[in-house]
């Protein structure tokens, strides 16, 4: 049975639904933009029966597909899980609210589908991928510092507009919700504005405007570091590193330390590190606006990055390690890492004589005990030994992080495994093993699209070696 409620404005689904994503904010006058009521069959046709090949995001139980309408235009279609939005009237009312929003930094919501227990949203399609892909799965070109500053500013503008329009909360704000339009400019996905508030969320405070500020802080940490950091670990990244250690190694010598310090301080405030008071959206916009010194920063570089990656997307045969990671065969991965030993570390870490003197025998014994436990598949002991080694050394072999990462995977702790894969990448930025292990951890976390992208990047790095 179809939904019994309809919005006041509907448009024939075959008409052109492309809207100007660069339009200025709506003023008080004029008519509200219409929302199209799509049939389930129309969306099914647009996505080729919701083919996995058309999935562009599966970060949560809600999946986003790329669809093509009868007029040839592309759209993004979000499919909610069957447990969401049980009240169709509430769903339509909220879709109507979001559909009225128009801002040059916000992706337009253009339609919906409410068919039985099925719920869908339809938005303009952004052709140049997400910030997450630009930062975490980059292959050839590092995102310029000036572009990162513009991304932060544009997202802050979008959040401030939404807050002013009465949308104080945003569902799981992250680098995956920041999209790039055809001009290479950053826009915030409108899908995150659709939140079904239940009594449990109200009680726990999970729907809280301050959550948006915190999550924006994690995006700032992403932009500084170039790394995928779970939101719960973002304060730890700020706490353990100064701005020099946090910065993306690919940006070395290519950024302003004064500007980076401003972003670092703002991220600390958003994450409430050391009890700092969180800024509001207008204060965030004002701070980031002062950093927009390169208004001519070429957004087309983002478009060029996309084109380069499409040219390089033809995957070659995977190595034995790549095949094992694709199969998520932990036993085979273990055998390969044991056989490799520390060979890959030789070109990365060369201890000076003074460092060798400081490397006391007891600490080396701790690592050897960890290695012995790792070989014998006593992974809890390996984790304990490697953790002690990591805590007492300023410079850690990337293979230690790799071995602890795999140990965490065996112990069913994929989030910690992902962090260690990132730590290994931080020491050795172009090490395929670090990316391979991250791909397995991402798959364990049900982040399948990101896992596939990371696996592909590892394979490309392996070819370049």
Swiss-Prot record:
Listed binding positions for ATP are 56-64, 78
Could you state one GO cellular component term attached to this entry? cytoplasmic side of plasma membrane
Keyword Phosphoprotein carried by entry? no
The record's annotation in Pfam families points to: PK_Tyr_Ser-Thr
Q: Which GO terms describe its molecular function?
A: ATP binding; protein serine/threonine kinase activity
Region Disordered, as annotated, extends over: 1-34
What remark about domains does the record contain? The protein kinase domain is predicted to be catalytically inactive.
Q: What does this protein do?
A: Probable inactive protein kinase that activates the YODA MAP kinase cascade, which regulates the asymmetric first division and embryo polarity, by promoting the elongation of the zygote and the development of its basal daughter cell into the extra-embryonic suspensor. Acts as an adapter at the plasma membrane, possibly by recruiting and binding an activator.
By sequence similarity, the record places it as follows: Belongs to the protein kinase superfamily. Ser/Thr protein kinase family.
Remaining remarks: BSK12 exerts a paternal effect on embryonic patterning. Transcripts produced but not translated in the sperm cells are delivered to the seed where they become translated, resulting in a transient accumulation of the protein in both products of the double fertilization, the zygote and the central cell.
Q: What is this protein called?
A: Probable inactive receptor-like kinase BSK12
Q: Which organism is it from?
A: Arabidopsis thaliana
Specify the taxonomic lineage. Answer: Eukaryota, Viridiplantae, Streptophyta, Embryophyta, Tracheophyta
Q: Which gene encodes it?
A: BSK12
